[in-house]
């Protein structure tokens, strides 16, 4: 064991000698450096005991370092008198108040915009102002005016006599069948001339149930006049004559 420790001691001594030589060369440039006696003395340096720069050899390396200075008691530290009240008035509070007032004056500008109004929904039928029916006449979709409720007002004698004369005149002319145009061909359902439409199309014949072709269409054809006033096709109620699904 002694043989194993002898080379180790020799290697350590060589390192220490090399470190000390480096430390001396370092200390030679600084007159305030003083060499330590060895590792043991460097290890025993404690706070408040060394007052100069020393070099220490630790594991073969040279460390030039400052050692701690003695601590000064707290009672001996210089102190500054703190006045109980500020000698000069400060404007900190006044500035804060003025800034707050200035902000509140223009606060409305920084407010977020009002939320938009919620969308208002309406029924499609509310967008229309008149009253028509949609009927399937002879396989075609037609706008037919709805019958208005009978007026409760009584007609004057002059109106009654004029109405009877009109009825007798109409009885002399040949009647047209329902759901047929005066020309004998099926109308497209929309009267381009502006005449009235027939309300009742309940009596369909086999001949009228057949779909008409475009050749039979007569733009000058019109339906038998009705006593109701003419309105535009909107706010329509759906009535299906024949087996057909339709929508307004």
From Swiss-Prot:
Keyword Hydrolase: no
Stretches the record annotates as Disordered: 169-248
Hydrolase found in the keyword field: no
Highest taxon listed in the record's lineage: Eukaryota
Biased composition (Acidic residues): 200-227
GO biological process: circadian behavior; nervous system development
InterPro entries named in the record: UPF0524_fam (IPR029670)
Keywords: Neurogenesis
Coiled-coil stretches noted in the UniProt entry, renumbered to this chain: none
Protein's job: May play a role in neuronal and neurobehavioral development.
Assigned protein family: Belongs to the UPF0524 family.
Full protein name: UPF0524 protein C3orf70 homolog
């Amino acid at each position: 064991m002694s043989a194993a420790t002898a080379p180790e001691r020799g290697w350590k001594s060589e390192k220490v000698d090399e470190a000390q030589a480096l430390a001396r060369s370092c200390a030679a440039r600084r007159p305030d450096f003083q060499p330590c006696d060895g590792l043991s003395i460097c290890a025993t340096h404690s706070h408040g005991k060394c007052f100069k720069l020393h070099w220490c050899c630790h594991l073969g390396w040279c460390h030039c370092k400052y050692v701690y200075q003695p601590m000064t008691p707290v009672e001996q530290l210089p102190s500054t008198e703190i006045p109980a009240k500020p000698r000069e008035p400060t404007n900190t509070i006044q500035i804060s108040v003025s800034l707050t007032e200035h902000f509140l004056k223009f606060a409305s500008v920084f407010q977020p915009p009002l939320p938009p109004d919620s969308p208002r929904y309406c029924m499609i039928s509310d967008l229309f102002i008149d009253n028509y029916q949609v009927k399937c006449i002879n396989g075609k979709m037609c706008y037919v005016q709805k019958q208005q409720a009978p007026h409760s007002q009584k007609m004057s004698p002059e109106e009654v006599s004029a109405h009877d004369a009109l009825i007798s005149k109409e009885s002399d002319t040949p009647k047209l069948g329902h759901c047929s145009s005066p020309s004998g061909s099926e109308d497209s359902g929309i009267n381009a001339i502006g005449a009235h439409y027939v309300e009742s199309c309940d009596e369909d014949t086999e001949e009228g149930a057949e779909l008409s072709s475009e050749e039979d269409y007569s733009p000058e054809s019109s339906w038998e006049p009705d006593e109701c006033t003419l309105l535009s096709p909107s706010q329509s109620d759906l009535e299906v004559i024949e087996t057909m699904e339709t929508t307004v």
